[in-house]
Amino acid sequence: MSASRKTLVVTNDFPPRIGGIQSYLRDFIATQDPESIVVFASTQNAEEAHAYDKTLDYEVIRWPRSVMLPTPTTAHAMAEIIREREIDNVWFGAAAPLALMAGTAKQAGASKVIASTHGHEVGWSMLPGSRQSLRKIGTEVDVLTYISQYTLRRFKSAFGSHPTFEHLPSGVDVKRFTPATPEDKSATRKKLGFTDTTPVIACNSRLVPRKGQDSLIKAMPQVIAARPDAQLLIVGSGRYESTLRRLATDVSQNVKFLGRLEYQDMINTLAAADIFAMPARTRGGGLDVEGLGIVYLEAQACGVPVIAGTSGGAPETVTPATGLVVEGSDVDKLSELLIELLDDPIRRAAMGAAGRAHVEAEWSWEIMGERLTNILQSEPR
């Protein structure tokens, strides 16, 4: 790919700092020719950043502050990199606010500017001042990527009609997220203290109100009445944990808080479940919403049927053959769906197989990487 258009990725969200946008950029960049990529990123911890950057096969230039803002000083530094590295594309890893520097990128010689959205722009679009910022970004970038049809519907008018909108959600590593063999599933369940026939519901996410772990706990008395040995596994950490633990007091024998697991342990736990459920619900008058929900897709890749919430883009991750959708605050309906699936192993197996096929066909990193390559390597319109 010697003729590749060279891309400068400008971002505050880059490893070793942990987070969703950081993972999104890291994994998308890994699908590209490393010689075509330069990253310009902020620095949260200089020592950790230096050690991490040495492991990469593309160049990373660090802004020596923990936050990069679209100031004249930052814009000047970015422009220097564009000129010195003969950059063709500038890709703002998160559109707001750094893509306010899109005009400077063009003036410095970049012929195409791409900016990615991740869902928080929905909130920006609802506030007059920040909505004006989105319109300025929309008038200066060439391509805006979005993670779900829901987020696009919510903020498209704020950005205006100038940019091309491209669907670019995260992919799933279908080589790591795979259905468990019977032996591996049994071993994971034994480690958790379960048998091969224990009904297991898993939820893997940050512990925050939007994700719906509280609704799952509230549904457990009805589930336990139908299946007394049913177990709910809550994987993850967050500020809502103490509230959830108090809520689970009366069902503590059937609810296990596993905390944040190592990556492979998380996958093993997910693949050992009978159902993955995260009944996400929109909160804060529409400001607190599920942009997409990659965990639903990871569960499907593991061959596990899914119960998703109605919030934001969550319903877009499943098909009628692979998962069910429920209003996250409707505990009675949630418990009904959980019991129906736990009582029907044939249906669960069919949904799991369909889920795996769905993710392989539509959501793998190979597919998403090709989509990004087309965006970056196509000539400006």
UniProtKB/Swiss-Prot annotation:
Keyword Transferase appears in the UniProt entry: yes
Highest taxon in the source lineage: Bacteria
Keyword Repressor: no
GO BP, one annotated term: phosphatidylinositol metabolic process
GO molecular function terms attached to this record: glycolipid 1,6-alpha-mannosyltransferase activity; phosphatidylinositol alpha-mannosyltransferase activity
EC number of the protein: 2.4.1.346
Knockout consequences: Cells lacking this gene are unable to produce monoacylated phosphatidyl-myo-inositol dimannoside (Ac1PIM2) resulting in the accumulation of Ac1PIM1, the absence of LAM and LM-A, and the presence of LM-B.
Chain positions recorded as GDP-alpha-D-mannose binding sites: 206, 211, 261, 298
InterPro entries: Glyco_trans_1, Glyco_trans_4-like_N, Glycosyltransferase_grp1
Pfam family, any one: Glycos_transf_1
Reaction(s) this enzyme catalyzes, per UniProt: a 1,2-diacyl-sn-glycero-3-phospho-[alpha-D-mannopyranosyl-(1<->6)-D-myo-inositol] + GDP-alpha-D-mannose = a 2,6-O-bis(alpha-D-mannopyranosyl)-1-phosphatidyl-1D-myo-inositol + GDP + H(+); a 1,2-diacyl-sn-glycero-3-phospho-[alpha-D-6-acyl-mannopyranosyl-(1<->6)-D-myo-inositol] + GDP-alpha-D-mannose = a 2-O-(alpha-D-mannosyl)-6-O-(6-O-acyl-alpha-D-mannosyl)-1-phosphatidyl-1D-myo-inositol + GDP + H(+)
Gene Ontology CC annotation, any one: membrane
Family designation: Belongs to the glycosyltransferase group 1 family. Glycosyltransferase 4 subfamily.
PANTHER family per UniProt: SULFOQUINOVOSYL TRANSFERASE SQD2 (PTHR45947:SF3)
Protein role: Involved in the biosynthesis of phosphatidyl-myo-inositol mannosides (PIM) which are early precursors in the biosynthesis of lipomannans (LM) and lipoarabinomannans (LAM). Catalyzes the addition of a mannosyl residue from GDP-D-mannose (GDP-Man) to the position 6 of a phosphatidyl-myo-inositol bearing an alpha-1,2-linked mannose residue (PIM1) to generate phosphatidyl-myo-inositol bearing alpha-1,2- and alpha-1,6-linked mannose residues (Ac1PIM2).
This protein's name: GDP-mannose-dependent monoacylated alpha-(1-6)-phosphatidylinositol monomannoside mannosyltransferase
Source species of the chain: Corynebacterium glutamicum (strain ATCC 13032 / DSM 20300 / JCM 1318 / BCRC 11384 / CCUG 27702 / LMG 3730 / NBRC 12168 / NCIMB 10025 / NRRL B-2784 / 534)
